[in-house]
Amino acid sequence: MFRQVYNLLEYLKFFLYGLIQGFTEFIPVSSTAHLKVISLFLGIDDPGASLSATIQLGSVLAIAWYFKNDIFNFRSQSSKKLIAYLLHKRLLRSILIGTIPIVLLGGSIKLFVPYFFDNVLRSNLSIALVSFLMAFFMYLADSSRRGSINIKNHNYSNSFLIGFFQAFAIFPGVSRSGITISSALISGWERGDAAKFSFLLGIPAISLAAIVEFISSFNDFFALGFFPLFVGLITTFVSSLLAIDFLLKYFSSNGLKIFIIYRVIFGIVILLNL
């Protein structure tokens, strides 16, 4: 009986981590910070690299599924569909170009400073301060004039600039979606397309992070077992779909104000519990 209760608690833990990852990966509040802080507050173990890789995969699958027509829409190059085809190819190139900065920065840190994130940058104090900084950056973005850049008319320099800011998401507490959406708004993107491009840009970025986690914890996958990881994967996939759909609809008529307030409150709560 005790064994059954223990297994149930393990499944609930994986379910909880999946929910947190799915919702906070796309809502601009930082999934890494929430996974770390909530695990500390609830007194449960850090999710670990193997579970992190699995739930990140769930987020990637959710993006790919939600935007499958944008990603996999390789139609024939008939004259009627030529413009759509060319726009599709340019979007894929833009995503690759926007991924370059985070690959360079993340790869350099992994190679030359492998224990970079095992220090003060992962502390609760650091996460709280980063949350305040992100709230200010998001405030600047929300206060900027509405732009006219979108998925169809953007250029490669636009995507590289957003990718440059995305690279800072390797620091715990930043929020990949938060910094990419905010930088897009500041540089003149329309709200809805800023969020959409941010999510699409997350496919290679989150995938690379999952691959790194997978390689570093390959043996742990067998120790955790298939079914607990599957629970985390499915939970993340479903909650990610809900988060993406919510945010795209929310951004059609709203700004970042509610998330700015949340990030300030989140930072204060962390400081009060140091």
Swiss-Prot record:
Subcellular location: Cell inner membrane
Keyword Kinase: no
EC number(s) recorded for this UniProt protein: 3.6.1.27
Topology of the protein relative to the lipid bilayer: Multi-pass membrane protein
GO BP term, pick one: regulation of cell shape
Transport listed as a keyword: no
InterPro entries per the UniProt record, alphabetical: UppP (IPR003824)
Keywords, in A-Z order: Antibiotic resistance, Cell inner membrane, Cell membrane, Cell shape, Cell wall biogenesis/degradation, Hydrolase, Membrane, Peptidoglycan synthesis, Transmembrane, Transmembrane helix
Gene: uppP
Name of the protein in its database record: Undecaprenyl-diphosphatase
Domain of life: Bacteria
Catalytic activity, as annotated: di-trans,octa-cis-undecaprenyl diphosphate + H2O = di-trans,octa-cis-undecaprenyl phosphate + phosphate + H(+)
GO MF annotation: an example: undecaprenyl-diphosphatase activity
Function: Catalyzes the dephosphorylation of undecaprenyl diphosphate (UPP). Confers resistance to bacitracin.
Gene Ontology cellular component list: plasma membrane
Family of the protein in this entry: Belongs to the UppP family.
